[in-house]
């Protein structure tokens, strides 16, 4: 899957936080965002993974504007595990990654061997 961000700008309470960010991340690539506190890294990511929908510019997943992707389909394509979480839960890293498979299953369906293999492959990449 390819991610392309074109001229992304985000303002919060009319204050510009991010201005003119463009980037491309190819299928299978890993990218790090570096910068000082308050420079807009988290704001950029929140726009990319739909936590903040108020932005200008374009965010494309495999060439498709994210605004045109249905929520369920977006959940199948993109999963986020935040660094900080206010909810105390007792899950292993593997169990949290496996939760990302939920949009690919039916309501009462359990994970399959294929899901387990996908999780193993994902964890092997990091």
PLM ranges: what are they?
Residues 68, 84-98, 103-109:
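Conserved catalytic motifs of ABC-family nucleotide-binding domains
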